[in-house]
Amino acid sequence: MISQLFHKHQGRYGYRRIVLALKHMGCHLNHKTVCKLMRQLHLKSTLRPRRYKSYRGEIGRIAPNHLSRSFDASRPNEKWVTDVTEFNVCGQKMFLSPILDLYNREIVSYELHERAHLGEVLRMVKGAAQRLEAHERPLLHSDQGWQYQMGQYQQTLKDYGITQSMSRKGNCLDNAVMENFFGLLKIEFFYRKKFESVDAFSQGLHGYIHYYNHDRIKEKLKGLSPVMYRTQSLLEPT
């Protein structure tokens, strides 16, 4: 059963998630036992990369660090984080720009493109804003990348009632949750496969983000996936 779960999730689950998945199936084993069995079965999950840097100095307005490493949220669409990461696929660079909700670590919007340009980032913001109820006014935190300093980006946030927040210069820990997602994405998806084309990479990436949102359980979310956790929270009486 442990081996089946490990291979079903393509080696992405370590012993902690295997314990949670077994629990959902009615099989209660402790962490030590699962860890020992995985070692005996030679089942080992995979490990972490280098980041794309979009900082080009102060070319626009720098926003305050409103998030201030407060990475927990009490409801959906309260606090979002974003960044851009780079992939080299078949000799071509591809750039992913996602928004992650700190409430349940769900990717609420993303854009994938051959170049890191402002249009991609604006489309991502608009995609996320379409999810908002009239009363919702999220905080959106980023690093000091050039895209986030541009007047057009900052005006778009204002138009949707989104408060801008920025990390301090050169301090990646101020956006640690987004950095962790990129590390996870590259370990569980990008480094595990050889892509024969950019199209194959794009399709695989879309599939992984769907898997991450809907199927990949998290200990922090009571053993649920991000979407399951959000759905359950909306059903709970207020």
PLM feature spans:
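Basic, flexible linker segments flanking DNA-binding modules
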Residues: 1-75, 171, 225-234
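Mobile genetic element proteins and their domesticated derivatives, centered on retroelements
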Residues: 2, 18, 34, 38, ...
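Residue-level detection of the helix-turn-helix DNA-binding "recognition helix"
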Residues: 23, 39, 43, 155, ...
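RNase H-like two-metal-ion nuclease catalytic core shared by retroviral integrases
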Residues: 56-58, 142-144, 150-151, 157, ...
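An active-site-proximal beta-strand-loop segment
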Residues: 69, 73-108, 114-116
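Short small-residue beta-strand/loop micro-motif enriched in glycine and branched aliphatics
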Residues: 104-110, 164-167, 191-192
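Active-site beta-loop-alpha junctions of metal-dependent nucleic acid enzymes
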Residues: 111-134
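C-terminal domain-tail junction helix/linker
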Residues: 158-162, 184-238
